[in-house]
């Protein structure tokens, strides 16, 4: 046991270069083994662990992944029939064409909010002092007309 510990202690410093911690394979079991393709003959070698993308390595089919021709359509039909069922909430009901993103204005929504009549502007005289409200140019024109 102590020899083994000495060997491990040596390995990090100047010890045998194949036991250095920087070598690629960490465990001695891997150092001595030949690659698996050489152990077995070419006849015995597996083709590939996953021959097609829908089979997993231990050879069980994954039924949710395989695409049998009717399956996706069956799901769609199920979903649609749920959408068309009479008791379904209305958000699942199918509309023939998608609604436009910007709502087109309805007839009833033409009113403008505010207490003014359409076509007349709101009286804003109380915002201004009387000197701001009188128009000197109009006064000059009126004087010119009277002359």
UniProtKB/Swiss-Prot annotation:
Presence of the UniProt keyword Manganese in the record: no
Domain of life: Eukaryota
Keyword S-adenosyl-L-methionine appears in the UniProt entry: no
One Pfam family of this chain: MPLKIP
Entries under InterPro entries matching the protein: TTDN1/SICKLE
Gene assigned in the entry: gs17
Record-given protein name: Gastrula-specific protein 17
Organism placement in taxonomy: Eukaryota, Metazoa, Chordata, Craniata, Vertebrata
Region (Disordered): 1-119
Biased composition (Polar residues): 20-36, 45-57, 74-88
């Amino acid at each position: 046991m102590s020899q083994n510990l000495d060997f491990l202690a040596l390995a990090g410093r100047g010890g045998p270069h194949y036991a250095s911690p920087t070598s690629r394979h960490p465990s001695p079991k891997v150092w001595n083994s030949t690659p698996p393709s050489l152990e077995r003959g070419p006849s015995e070698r597996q083709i590939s662990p996953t021959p097609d993308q829908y089979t997993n390595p231990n050879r069980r089919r994954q039924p949710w992944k395989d695409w049998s021709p009717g399956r996706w359509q069956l799901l769609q039909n199920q979903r649609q029939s749920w959408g068309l069922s009479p008791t379904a909430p209305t958000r699942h009901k199918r509309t023939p064409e998608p609604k436009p993103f910007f709502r087109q204005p309805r007839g009833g929504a033409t009113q403008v909010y505010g207490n003014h009549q359409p076509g007349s502007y709101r009286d804003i005289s109380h915002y201004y002092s009387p000197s701001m409200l009188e128009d000197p140019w109009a006064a000059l024109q009126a004087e010119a007309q009277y002359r």
